[in-house]
């Protein structure tokens, strides 16, 4: 794994996903092409995993973190939606379905010219996978 600061720090911004099981959630995003570049602690059960896909970054963090750091409780509802572009929407949905992911909406060509499907990450957050329409 690389150092966490490959870019100048002032140029970085990324979403943080609060997860009940950090490693399981990271595996879901790794199936979408993200690569693990940082983990704390480095060995054992992680409380933080940094992922990259090209210039995009995401952090998967234990849902206990906000309460420990600033006394806020992470709720159980949808906390965000991730939108991820892939080379082949249908193939990606099939692979994630086979690995146990829940498909919320089957792939469909949208009016704005993309093919989009929605899945649920391991904590129930919606994740759109999008790409070119089927020709």
Predicted regions mapped to residue ranges:
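C-terminal catalytic core of tyrosine-transesterase DNA break-rejoin enzymes
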Residues: 123
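Amphipathic alpha-helical segments
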Residues: 21-36
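Residues at or immediately preceding the N-termini of alpha-helices
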Residues: 22, 89-90
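Vicinal oxygen chelate
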Residues: 1-16, 32-85, 91-120, 131-135
């Amino acid at each position: 794994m690389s150092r966490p600061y490959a870019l100048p720090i002032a140029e970085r911004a990324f979403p943080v996903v609060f997860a009940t099981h950090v490693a399981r959630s990271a595996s879901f995003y790794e199936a979408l092409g993200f690569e693990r570049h940082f983990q704390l602690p480095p060995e054992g059960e992680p409380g933080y995993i940094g992922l990259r896909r090209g210039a995009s970054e995401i952090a998967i963090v234990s849902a206990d973190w906000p309460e420990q750091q600033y006394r806020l409780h992470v709720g159980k509802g949808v906390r965000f939606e991730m939108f991820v572009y892939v080379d082949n929407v249908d193939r990606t949905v099939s692979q994630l379905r086979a690995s146990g992911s829940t498909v919320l909406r089957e792939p469909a060509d949208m009016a704005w010219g993309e093919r989009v499907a929605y899945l649920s990450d391991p904590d129930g957050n919606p994740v759109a996978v999008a790409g070119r329409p089927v020709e």
